[in-house]
Amino acid sequence: MEKRIGSILLAVCLLLLASCGAKRETVAVEPDIAAQSSVPEADLTSLRQLSQEGALWQLDGTTLYTTVAAPQSRGKLLQTVDLNTGKRQALCSKPGCTHQDESCGAWLDCESEIAVLPMEDGRLVLVYGRYGPLEKQGAELSAAVELRDTSGAVLCPATPLPHRPSGAFYTDEIAVYYLREQWQEDGSADVSLIRIELDAAKGFGQASTAAFWQLPVMLSLTERCTEQGMLAIRWEHRMEGQTQVVQHRELCLVQWDGTVRTVAEAKDEQAFLVPDTGAIAAFCFDSATGTMARLDLATGESEPFARLPEGLQLTEGSACVGNVLICNFIQDGEAKPFYLEKGGEPVEIRRQTSHNGYLRPAMVLDVLEDGRLIVDLGDLEYEESYTDQTGQWITSRTSETLLGVCTPEQYREGAADCLTLETNHKF
């Protein structure tokens, strides 16, 4: 696997979480937020999230899909990793294939990160940036979508998309969806939920708008969705001396019909946490008291979840599995992941991993359908040799990220017994 996993962002957001006790049942309809759909048949209440923003792998519960640079041509080769054995192979069924160039069945004319989106019926939807002529300033970057089966055979060939998607993807098993944000000069955002057709008879790859919102300046989507809509956080700036910090004010649900419902309200020193991966949930953390509470998304009511040391500040990176929450904090300028179980004592994860010569905590990157975790185990550095375009033999040092699979309980104990996935270097 190519090294694509950069440093998980650990800059302090001074996220100050929302009041855990506020119960709000009214629905506030805001005149500047409107939803509209050009796809009457789209059932947005059945959407499930397929990937998170920035995810560098795609999972169907048993398989990890990834790409590597084609050794002897441009483009990338699609690979799979068995999440029960750790073994890696090219997604190619051609007998005798050496998996080197565009003749390989796993080859993609791809020049940017790829999203591999597994459907429940076994189809794989591939969305990726494509090579093309130099773009004019302000023009959309090239992108394509194609459909394959689990053997790698092409069901629908690469079809151009009107613009290059980014962020999370969703599906109702009929189409795939993604969010497209267009920022305005006043800081507000026009947000479209774009639907990509998967039925060849209806025009595979055809893009349309399934929903549209005009969001005010200080209302930000989290990309996590429920049956009713997208979770969002309303925030504001405040000053602490000469420092401008972000203060959370409301946890909201931007509903599919365009209305916005307030789930809970914030007090000073509190912040909302909507886990990046795993179960759809919301938590409230009070940095002054160290109290973590879980919020009921339907009523806004809260229940105590865990107690942490005072003075911690939430930062990015979190996962929820049942009654277990794994999240990252900053304390005295250092990043510290914690394992929290409802009603139990918090456990600081002390395992360190090396990235580019720097140590940092072992981070949870994703949650499998069976509740196991994908964990960043640090970098593997090695030498690689190849012949360049002039015929010269080149040797250089490179690295790729080691990934492990473990249960939440194994992670709590330092992930020493995790399954290490085979690297591309060993493949």
Predicted regions and their residues:
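Bacterial N-terminal signal peptides that target proteins for export
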Residues: 1-9
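C-terminal motif of bacterial Sec signal peptides marking the signal peptidase cleavage site
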Residues: 16-19
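Bacterial signal peptide processing site
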Residues: 21-23
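Surface-exposed loop/turn elements that mediate protein-protein interactions on large endomembrane-trafficking
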Residues: 29-48, 75-101, 135-160, 185-214, ...
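N-terminal export/targeting and maturation segments
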Residues: 35-74, 274
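Repeated scaffold domains used in trafficking and secretory/extracellular systems
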Residues: 49-59, 100-118, 162-173, 214-227, ...
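Residue position within the beta-strands of beta-propeller blades
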Residues: 65-67, 125-128, 177-180, 232-234, ...
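Residue-level signature of beta-propeller blades and closely related beta-rich strand-turn architectures
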Residues: 70, 130-132, 182, 236-237, ...
